[in-house]
Structures are given as structure tokens and as C-alpha cells.
């Protein structure tokens, strides 16, 4: 049987371009051959200002890019603050929120992913972080809505003595993004 062709988008996390202005970061993203950008909050701040959101979205479109995700966003027990992030993402057309959620945020996040039909992708960090191991992420998402999953930062997993191929295998079905880096 012939292999099924797959299309996936390859983007850059804007944090990698944090020393550049928004316009320069978008231009560099396009010049590097990427078709998507994952914004981080300092480059595309969380706001309910529709004019500001439209301006950024137009700049993204002008470069022929799309937004793959937004993060890494902190989520806590503050349901009002969490809702602001989701409302912003909905207005901006962002379907995945890369996140570092506290344990007490998950009940609210579960409600929000259902209400907004968005995904939350837990981003792991290196040794000592609450999500340094793939099992930490799997425990956090266990018995949660399928829209709560992972964004596997493979560089951080390597620092935490995890094997990237095994991480990807274990997160199958709940892996909504991958960050690649070389420290």
C-alpha cells in the first residue's frame, strides 16, 4: 500500500526571536522558510483590544504565515485570569495555548477547553520543574478532557534525562506541539 501523504506545518517559537521587533520576527520567520509562528506573551500580549489583535493578525497574514499556538501561558486557580487568556485566543483565532498550569488550575482549564473548543498543551521545562518528566505531564492530563495535552520541548526532556522518541510515543494522541532546541 502506498504511504498516506501527510502535511504538517513547521513553525518557530517567537521566544527564539525575542530580541527582534514583531515585524522583524515575522520577516525572519518567513525568510527561514517556516509557515507558522508560536507567539509568546511579550511579543503578542494578551489583550481584549480588538484593534491591537487585528493589527498583529494582519502582519502575520502579510507574511503568509499562520499562528500555530500562543504561550507559554501560566494558568492558576484564578479562573477570571484564565478566561482572559482563552478569550484573547478566541478573538485571535488561536486554537492551541501552550501552558505551564498549576495543579489547582485543571478543573477550570477543563471547563474552558470545552467552552472554547481549544487545546491546552502543557510545556515541560528542565530538571526541577513540575513537568520535567513525561510522567509528570501524563499524570496531569490523566482523566482530563482530550483537549488538554502536551507540547513536548525535546531539549528540556533531554536535560531531564528523557528519551525524545519515547516521550513522543508516550504522548501519542495528546501531543499538540513539539519544541526543538539545541542548548
What do these predicted ranges mean?
Residues 12, 39, 99, 122, ...:
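Conserved beta-strand positions
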Residues 167-183:
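Aromatic-lined glycan-binding groove of carbohydrate-active enzymes
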Residues 42, 75, 102, 180-183:
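Flexible loop residues that form catalytic
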Amino acid at each position: 500500500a502506498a504511504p498516506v501523504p501527510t502535511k504538517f506545518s513547521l513553525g518557530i517559537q517567537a521566544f527564539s526571536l525575542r530580541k527582534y521587533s514583531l515585524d522583524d520576527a515575522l520577516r525572519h520567520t518567513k525568510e527561514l522558510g517556516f509557515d507558522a509562528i508560536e507567539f509568546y506573551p511579550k511579543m503578542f500580549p494578551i489583550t481584549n483590544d480588538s484593534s491591537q489583535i487585528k493589527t498583529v493578525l494582519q502582519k502575520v497574514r502579510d507574511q503568509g504565515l499562520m499562528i500555530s499556538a500562543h504561550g507559554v501561558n501560566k494558568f492558576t486557580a484564578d479562573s477570571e485570569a484564565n478566561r482572559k487568556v482563552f478569550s484573547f485566543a478566541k478573538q485571535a483565532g488561536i486554537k492551541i495555548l501552550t501552558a505551564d498550569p498549576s495543579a489547582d488550575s485543571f478543573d477550570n482549564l477543563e471547563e474552558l477547553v470545552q467552552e472554547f473548543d481549544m487545546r491546552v498543551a502543557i510545556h515541560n521545562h528542565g530538571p526541577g520543574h513540575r513537568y520535567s518528566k513525561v510522567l509528570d505531564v501524563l499524570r496531569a492530563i490523566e482523566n482530563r478532557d482530550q483537549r488538554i495535552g502536551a507540547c513536548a520541548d525535546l531539549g528540556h526532556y533531554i536535560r531531564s534525562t528523557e528519551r525524545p522518541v519515547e516521550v513522543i510515543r508516550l504522548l501519542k494522541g495528546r501531543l499538540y506541539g513539539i519544541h526543538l532546541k539545541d542548548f
